[in-house]
Amino acid sequence: MKNPAGANEVLRTLALEDGEHDVLAVLNDQTADGRDVSWVWDADFEVLAGRLRHVTCSGTRAAEMALRLKYAGVPTDRLAVEPSLGAALDRAVAGANGRLVAIPTYTAMLELRQELVGRGVAGSSFG
């Protein structure tokens, strides 16, 4: 996700699925992501607020992501902030009840992929 429109599409897709979701939300503000992450306040996270079992927030703006989710109505006892992606992934996987949904910004997606390759759970090429 990189802007409200992209985030809203992800959120609406998740809202179509039954049950609660365990989420790893990774918000970075690197150049390729865009330094200004205020767009998260324009995304409709409220659509999932009551359907998030647990959210682990990570990335360079992990605290901002958690704050946005709090204001969207996600109870604080369902939120965790872990800026280190590796530690956040460990925490999110350990707390997940089955499937874990990752919602990263662009550079976070690249970092997450590298982390998964390093752990041997993803291939090293895109092909």
Model-derived segments and their meaning:
Residues 1-127:
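ATP-dependent carboxylate-amine ligase
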